[in-house]
Swiss-Prot record:
GO terms for molecular function: cholesterol binding; cholesterol transfer activity. It holds the Pfam family GRAM. GO terms for biological process: cellular response to cholesterol; intracellular sterol transport. This is Protein Aster-C. The gene is GRAMD1C. The chain crosses the membrane at residues 557-577. InterPro entries: Cholesterol_transport, GRAM, PH-like_dom_sf, VASt. One of its GO terms (cellular component) is endoplasmic reticulum-plasma membrane contact site. Residues 326-497 form the VASt domain.
Length: 662
């Protein structure tokens, strides 16, 4: 942790005015005080906004009510305006592991543990956090988070979903550092993300609830929405250098964010900062008629709000509703392809999709034509087989994809398609499915914007380890899939524009795109692979041959395994027969021994004393004979030893005489 810049150091590098504001806030919230039981308690300064007291009327979930009441009861020193946003089961590493719960609100991070009436209470103001990282328990298990303040370090471990918990805390921490307050709509969106399945409301009621809460959102007197938006944009432009440096510092340990956060904040920030300064007034006027912009996003799409503020070369994008899914945004860029051409490439049996399916090892593709539904939407169904290389999922899996073209779509202007994908042969396939949303927005006659967002849906709730395994594999596969799709679309874009544009313009266009796009480094390699056009296109004969080879391989494997199992069964039968024979022989020998012992006992009772004396005499006579023979043998041995000794003496004398003569 040495060398990690503190909040004040980073703020001094960015803007002195914003640093002064945060410095005043830190002074209002003093450093933690350590009590006798090593409990850290921090006091909160005056809050920037006040929540209305009628918000709890809408909560129908007793679980959230219980959590919030428990939170208020355990942390009575916090202001009444603090509302619980999320809570996680974890443990604090001290001399021993203190198992408890971590509570997250808008301005505070609190921990409570009660082990045999030994209570531990910790309250950390988010603005006092200087650094936070993902850690590993015992340098092996990735389930820990370390929180660092100016005076202490807190090591929380045993998280069920470490990456999600870290992301939530990190976003609220950044929100506090930027001096942003949650709106009521944002607060309810966070509750939906953390307690959505336990609130007891359906999606339509949740949406109406968010809109009604937004309509009655309190405002401070004498302050218009234009002033509020202007102040927010001004603070955002002032602190843009601070956020970029802070996020880049933490992104080294944030493997869960992947390339989307790097592409959003790392490379587009300087461009959006300039555009925000140039078009500040038009942006503020738009905010008066639209829903307020989000100050944070727990779905890993930090650059969405910045992307929306940038101006495009057409007015069509502004009039199109952007409805991304709540998961992740994988593609968001403008292609030099018309909107209708993009739709044909992605949602028809085009040569592009055939090549793309072949490169992704997708075979046996069968699709139905677009059919109109009663509600005005259009439906298309696809079935195919995905050849897999993972040892955990098998050789291949069948998949069904249901594509829905919504009635809000306008030909050659705007297309919104939802793709629901179900895989049938992967582990835990009955627990989850994925939903992809494609938004094709016309920018100009030969340009369109493609936005692809994805969400992971659950049919039934799995337990923690299974859920983390599903999310890890699913998000990794989806990210690789859409990176490949974006790269192939760039190649197709260059092929389509090659006949229209001059070579010089095309070279300049590629050069500019290479410096802007996060996936442009992979484009030259892919273009060299697909430069021949139809080289990667697999014919039906090739697909059939691959399928037959796979079937033959499976049959051969089954035959070999059957023979092996049969041999094992025969070996077990042989061993069983031998073991039974050995057991029978042992029982026979035991019975014979018992009979001999019984006969000896009976003989000893019948034999008379005279016979016993005679036997004793006979034994004594035999012993005398043995002793006599032993004595004779000892005498012979003695004579032999004497002769041997004489022989050795004679040899020694001869050797001594020879030595003297020499």
């Amino acid at each position: 942790m040495e060398g990690a810049p503190t909040v004040r150091q980073v703020m001094n590098e960015g803007d002195s005015s914003l640093a002064t504001e945060l410095q005043e806030d830190v002074e209002e919230n003093p450093s933690p005080t350590v009590e006798e039981n090593n409990v850290v308690v921090k006091k909160q300064g005056p809050n920037l906004h006040n929540w209305s007291g009628d918000w709890s009327f809408w909560i129908s979930s007793s679980t959230y009510k219980d959590r919030n009441e428990e939170y208020r009861r355990q942390f009575t020193h916090l202001p009444d305006t603090e509302r619980l946003i999320a809570d996680y089961a974890c443990a604090l590493q001290r001399d021993i592991l203190l198992q408890g719960r971590l509570y997250l609100s808008e301005n505070w991070l609190c921990f409570y543990s009660n082990i045999f009436r030994w209570e531990t209470t910790i309250s950390i103001a988010l603005k006092n956090i200087t650094f936070m990282t993902k850690e590993k328990t015992a340098r092996l298990i990735p389930n820990a988070i370390q929180i660092v303040t100016e005076s202490e370090k807190f090591f929380f471990t045993s998280f069920g979903a470490r990456d999600r918990s870290y992301l939530s805390i990190f976003r609220l921490w950044q929100n506090v550092l930027l001096d942003k307050s949650l709106t009521r709509q944002e607060f309810w969106q966070l509750l939906q993300q953390n307690y959505g399945t336990e609130l007891g409301l359906n999606a339509e009621e949740m949406e109406n609830l968010s809109l009604s809460i937004e309509d009655v959102r309190p405002r401070s007197p004498g302050r218009s929405s234009l002033d509020d938006s202007g102040e927010r944009d001004e603070k955002l432009s002032k602190s843009i250098s601070f956020t970029s440096e802070s996020i880049s510092r933490v992104s080294e340990t944030e493997s869960f964010d992947g390339n989307s956060s790097k592409g959003g904040l790392g490379k587009e920030e300087s461009q959006n900062e300039k555009q925000t300064k140039k078009s500040l007034l038009p942006t503020l006027e738009k905010k008066l008629t639209r829903v307020p912009s989000k100050s944070l996003d727990l779905n890993k799409n930090e650059y969405l709000s910045l992307e929306k503020s940038s101006t495009s070369d057409s007015v069509d994008e502004e009039n199109v509703p952007e409805k991304d899914l709540h998961g992740r945004l994988f593609i968001n860029r403008i292609f030099h392809i018309s909107a209708d051409r993009m739709f044909e490439l992605l949602f028809t049996s085009s040569r592009f999709m055939q090549k793309f399916a072949s490169s992704r090892n997708i075979i046996d593709v069968v699709s139905t034509p677009w059919t109109a539904e009663l509600g005005g939407d259009q439906l298309r169904t696809m079935t195919y087989t995905i050849v897999l290389n993972s040892p955990l999922t098998g050789k291949c899996t069948a998949a069904t994809e249901k594509q829905t073209l919504y009635k809000e779509s306008r030909e050659a202007r705007f297309y919104m398609v939802d793709s629901e994908v179900l895989t049938h042969d992967v582990p835990y396939h009955d627990y989850f499915y994925t939903v992809d949303r494609y938004c094709i927005i016309r920018s100009s006659k030969q340009k369109c914007r493609l936005r692809v967002s994805t969400d992971l849906k659950y049919r039934k709730q799995p337990w923690g380890l299974v859920k983390s395994l599903i999310e890890k594999n699913s998000w990794g596969s989806l990210e690789d899939y859409f990176k490949h799709l974006e790269s192939d679309l760039l190649i197709e874009e260059s092929i389509l524009n090659q006949a229209i544009e001059d070579p010089g313009k095309l070279t300049g266009l590629r050069r500019r795109r290479r410096t802007f796009n996060r996936t442009a480094e992979t484009v030259p390699k892919l273009s060299s692979q697909h430069s021949s056009g139809d080289v990667g296109l697999g014919t039906k004969a090739d697909i059939t041959g691959k399928k037959k080879e796979m079937e033959n391989y499976n049959i051969t494997l089954i035959v070999v395994m059957s023979i092996f199992v049969l041999l094992l069964v025969l070996l077990n039968v042989t061993l069983f027969l031998k073991l039974s024979k050995i057991e029978h022989a042992a029982q026979s020998f035991y019975r014979l021994r018992l009979q001999e012992e019984k006969s000896l006992n009976l003989a000893s009772d019948v034999v008379s004393r005279a016979e016993t004396i005679q036997n004793n005499k006979d034994q004594a006579h035999r012993l005398k004979g043995v002793l006599r023979d032993s004595i004779v043998m000892l005498e012979q041995l003695k004579s032999s030893l004497i002769m041997l000794q004489k022989t050795f003496d004679l040899l020694n004398k001869n050797k001594t005489g020879m030595a003297v003569e020499s």
